[in-house]
UniProtKB/Swiss-Prot annotation:
Its EC number is 3.4.24.-. It is an enzyme of class 3 (hydrolase). It holds the Pfam family Peptidase_M16_C. Belongs to the peptidase M16 family. Zn(2+) binds at residues 49, 53, 129. GO terms for molecular function: metal ion binding; metalloendopeptidase activity. SUPFAM superfamilies: LuxS/MPP-like metallohydrolase. Keywords: Hydrolase, Metal-binding, Metalloprotease, Protease, Zinc. Disulfide bonds: none annotated. Its cofactor is Zn(2+). This is Uncharacterized zinc protease RF_0338. It comes from Rickettsia felis (strain ATCC VR-1525 / URRWXCal2) (Rickettsia azadi). The lineage of its organism: Bacteria, Pseudomonadati, Pseudomonadota, Alphaproteobacteria, Rickettsiales. Coiled coil: none annotated.
Length: 412
């Protein structure tokens, strides 16, 4: 509900958003930085993620151990993650400890010291993270897949970066990146739960006043390119991914049409892919579809794993189902998909962590809060013909494929 939502902008330009949920005892805090891997140039690849790691390694007032101990002392859960377009630092604590959590988050964002010995240690940690990813067939195939979808573009590069660039980063590199992107105009503080907006604003003014004013960071437009790739790996099954140009999140009507398409086609146990590929033909255990979305681009993805000798049949059946999806959608499918989507969205509204991230991401993306009632109206007004038209648009785009399996399947 709109009356629970409040927004203020500090003198330095920092946006403070709150959503009051008086029936809970906790708060979720998100500090959203509008910068991620797609903002990096070729010499910076991996720095957004590396910086996120370094934020917890000590400040001018706290050691890394003290940061961890202080959060444990208030029973808090805190962490951070890096995406293509945002880096998010978050905490969840009891309402009575909100100010203490804000104090720690403000400290690590503004006062990290980037000690050279900590940089060297964390470099080794990230190398292990990369190695773990390379040993994971799912991570490996999706990395290859996106390198074809967004060939030679930041969106097509791994968020973790590569050892060549990671090994070059020094304290000066991190401080320069912070100076460029971690300014008040590019940050959003969002808090949801049992929260008093005026108190949050007062705390933010005290804790974030040293943030300099600045502009929002920009990136180059993404261009869907597509292509085919193959990874030779001896596994029990072969995994196939098919991709098409999807929908960006900036257009909500198109976005939710695509979301409904993904649900009908491969989003659940009653979906077409699950019923046909798994239940009827027994070709795959895991099969489905979804839309990955960015501010100016999107990728509609179909995935399935099968026995090596069934790959050709799987591909043929997937193509047949794609064709059928462009021809007809029945009312029962529409009702199920809308109910599923509405249920997921509305049930998520009850979680403080979701709500805090939602209001922050809404404002970072659209410059406003989009209440769930508005989303529900969009979903309600979508017709079967809208889904068919969306399917035709998406599936007529260039196909991207990625396969991981034994070498004799190359070029099947």
């Amino acid at each position: 509900m709109k009356e629970n939502f409040n927004i203020s902008k500090l003198k330095n330009g920092l946006t403070v958003l709150t959503y009051n949920m008086p029936y809970v005892d906790s708060v979720a805090i998100n500090l959203i930085t509008k910068v991620g891997s797609r903002y990096e140039n070729s010499e910076e690849e991996g720095i957004s993620h590396f910086l996120e790691h370094m934020a917890f390694k000590g400040t001018t007032t706290r050691t890394a151990k003290q940061i961890a101990e202080e959060f444990d002392e208030i029973g808090g859960h805190f962490n951070a993650y890096t995406g293509h377009e945002k880096t998010i630092y978050y905490a969840r604590v009891l309402s009575e400890n909100c100010d203490k959590a804000l104090n720690i988050l403000a400290d690590i964002i503004q006062n990290s010291i980037f000690a050279e010995e900590e940089i060297a240690k964390e470099y080794q940690v990230i190398l292990q993270e990369i190695a773990h990813s390379q040993d994971n067939p799912d991570d490996l195939i999706y990395e290859k897949f996106y390198s074809s979808v967004y060939k030679d573009q930041p969106l097509g590069k791994p968020i973790l970066g590569a050892s060549k660039t990671l090994s070059s980063f020094t304290k000066e590199h991190f401080l320069s990146f912070i100076d460029k992107h971690y300014n008040a105009g590019n940050l959003y503080l969002s808090v949801a739960g049992n929260v008093d907006h005026d108190k949050i604003v007062s705390s933010a003014e005290r804790l974030f006043s040293s943030l300099k004013q600045g502009e929002k960071s920009n990136f180059l437009p993404a261009k869907y390119i597509g292509g085919n790739s193959f990874i030779n790996k001896d596994l029990e099954q072969t995994t196939l991914i098919l991709g098409f140009e999807g929908t960006p999140y900036i257009n909500l009507e198109r976005l939710y049409r695509t979301q409904l398409l993904a649900i009908i086609f491969g989003g659940g146990m009653s979906s077409r892919l699950f019923q046909h590929i798994r239940e009827k033909l027994g070709l795959a255990y895991a099969v489905g579809s979804y839309n990955s979305t960015y501010s100016d681009s999107g990728v509609f993805t179909i995935y399935a794993s099968t026995a090596h000798d069934k790959l050709e049949l799987l591909y043929k059946e997937l193509k047949t189902e794609i064709t059928k999806m462009t021809e007809k959608v029945n009312e029962e499918e529409m009702i199920r998909a809308k109910t599923q989507l509405r249920s997921n969205l509305l049930m998520a509204q009850e979680k403080v962590a979701y709500k805090s991230e939602e209001i922050g991401k809404n404002y970072a993306a659209f410059g406003k809060y989009i209440p769930p009632e508005e989303i529900m109206e969009i979903i309600t007004n979508i017709k079967a013909d809208d889904i068919i038209n969306t399917a035709n648009k998406i599936f007529s785009s260039i196909t991207t494929s990625a396969i991981i399996g034994p070498n004799d399947l190359r070029g099947f």
